[in-house]
Amino acid sequence: MANEYKKILLLKGLELMDEYHFIIIKSLLAYDLGLTTKMQEEYNRIKISDLMEKKFQGVACVDKLIELAKDMPPLKNLVNNLRKERSKVARKMKAQGVVLMKKINQEEVGLVAPAPTARNTLTSEVGERIPVAQKRKTLSKGKTEAKRIKVPQEQSEPPHPSGASTSAATDHPPLPHTSSSTPSNTSFAQNQQTQAQCQVDTRRNVPQKDPVTVMVLKATAPFKYESPEHGKSTMFHATVASKTQYFHVKVFDISLKEKFIRKKVITISDYSECKGVMEIKEASSVSDFDQNFEVPNRIIEIANKTPKISQLYKQASGTMVYGLFMVQKKSIHKKNTIYEIKDNTGSMDVVGNGKWHNIKCEKGDKLRLFCFQLRTVNRKLKLVCGSHSFIKVIKAKKNKEGSMNVN
């Protein structure tokens, strides 16, 4: 799909520009692409697209051209067309991903064996190589036995939007999405690990068609990240709230940054939900909402509330965490840094690597964490950073919040 984005860049972007605006684009790209004055004069559209593809991999090359061209009024139609073409490719990639996942599920689970749920866990476990006649008998027996299995309430409830994604800590309504029951009998967990993983993969990103109107509470500065599907790209985090609940948001379309201004009311559609967090991508739509819209103070207070560390220890591994925590200790290692955070209920380690390795902070400072994940490391629950994680540091002495410059 990377080639699809390059086709958009070259055929729908650079090739449709007049010479004057192409010269401007080359000048603006000179620093990023390392262009000398001579190169700017000699390089044509094909050469520039080759360099942009290497520097800004995947969709990032189209994003970069949009970013540069959107401030040029004569290129307004070209920019709109680039966004449409980018969305088409994004939808195509999403559709191919669904087809591929279905194929994987069929290969792993088998076309005959049903997906493991609370009702058919027993049959899917033993039905892999049983003759048809015997399988029917086993299925009947399995259904009878499965009725005795009770699904715990916490497993049947949909995940909450993460405030640290913890209902106990924040007491908020869930992010609307489709959920399915999970097997409750732990004795079958090991045997069905492959099937369960397939189910998790297909559920990890759930499209949401219904639009939602929200007020922007806060947003981070854009930052660079790297992922297998997009390579190096840019995103930012935001927190928004409707009249009944709040959402942590990952925004992967940087052109939407101007929409995420504090107290601005917007309508979001065609977004998706992953692990309780709203995701806005190229195919999503964000528009202004001009009517009167008020968010109850209680919702805003809950959205801004940091979960207690004692509550984090009660959450499952994999829970997404957001919040403001005080640094108690900083331990620098060769490959990562351990930031010990503390409140009046306990302490926990935050593992920072990559861009979050050895950031400038000390005891007494506060770390505002975005999109950190609870993980069990050496039999101890810790907060671990991922590719989408972000940290803001609030210095204790100056009491002034600022994001780390890590690029």
UniProtKB/Swiss-Prot annotation:
Q: Where is this region: Disordered?
A: 122-211
Q: Which GO terms describe its cellular component?
A: cytosol; nucleolus; nucleoplasm
One GO MF term, please? double-stranded DNA binding
**Coiled coil location:** none
Q: Name one GO biological process term.
A: activation of innate immune response
Enumerate the subcellular locations listed in this protein's record, separating them with semicolons. Nucleus; Cytoplasm
Extent of motif Nuclear localization signal: 131-137
* Family matches, as SMART domains: PYRIN
> Compositional bias (Low complexity) spans?
177-199
Q: Which UniProt keywords apply?
A: Activator, Cytoplasm, DNA-binding, Nucleus, Repressor, Transcription, Transcription regulation
Keyword set includes Nucleus: yes
Q: Where is the HIN-200 domain?
A: 196-394
Stretches assigned to the Pyrin domain: 1-88
Q: Is the Cytoplasm keyword given for this protein?
A: yes
What is its quaternary makeup? Participates in a ternary complex with YY1 and the YY1 target DNA element. Binds nucleolin and nucleophosmin/NPM/B23.
What's noted about domains in the record?
Its N-terminal half (200 amino acids) is sufficient for maximum enhancement of YY1 DNA binding and a portion of this sequence is responsible for binding YY1.
The job of this chain, per UniProt, is described as: May act as a transcriptional activator/repressor in the myeloid lineage. Plays a role in the granulocyte/monocyte cell-specific response to interferon. Stimulates the DNA binding of the transcriptional repressor protein YY1.
| Protein name from the UniProt record | Myeloid cell nuclear differentiation antigen
Q: Which organism is it from?
A: Macaca fascicularis
